[in-house]
Amino acid sequence: MTQGELERKYEDFVTEYTYNSNAIEGNTLTLRETALVLRGLTIDKKPLKEHLEATQHRDAFYYVLGLVKGTPRKLDEATIKQIHSIVLNDRPEDRGVYRKMPVRIMGASHIPPNWAKIPTLMHELIEWYNSEKPTRTRIAEFHARFEQIHPFIDGNGRTGRLIANLEIMKLGFEPVDIKFANRKEYYDALNEYDETKEVKRLETLFI
């Protein structure tokens, strides 16, 4: 594949991926509108926030892609916070900062832990993940546990899916795009992990 073909492949992927990941979180831009926004156009009657969510998610994906192409290293807290910082680039007071208030997860019965426990829980999660060689199963479980913790005030879903793709691509696989049309299956898989610690259903979405 030529460099131009590779760039076109990722351009097409990031448009659909950005649309789906943002739509899962409530962004109302259509796929075509997302494509136009990523080309620098403004969509009439759509809020600035939704435009920024699109461009910032794209930028976060290309940051992740750069990490994959760079010197291999284990997942760490600094990388997670940097990905989140790009996703929430328009909110300097919140980006890359663990939340300091209670939150609820859209579409989930699980109640995230008290914010005071987040630094410890994230440290333990990262230590657990890096304690063995990564696999798709381990990536899926990391994602489920990350979403349970819900460490940030906003952007947890988008950030969590970007982290999953970082780790998937580090294994040599193509990035995964969980479709907006499959959001119920995605939420159900997360809820199933909350209730049973069974990750197979979620793992199938990362293939």
Residues covered by each model-derived region:
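FIC/Doc superfamily catalytic core
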Residues: 1-154, 158-207
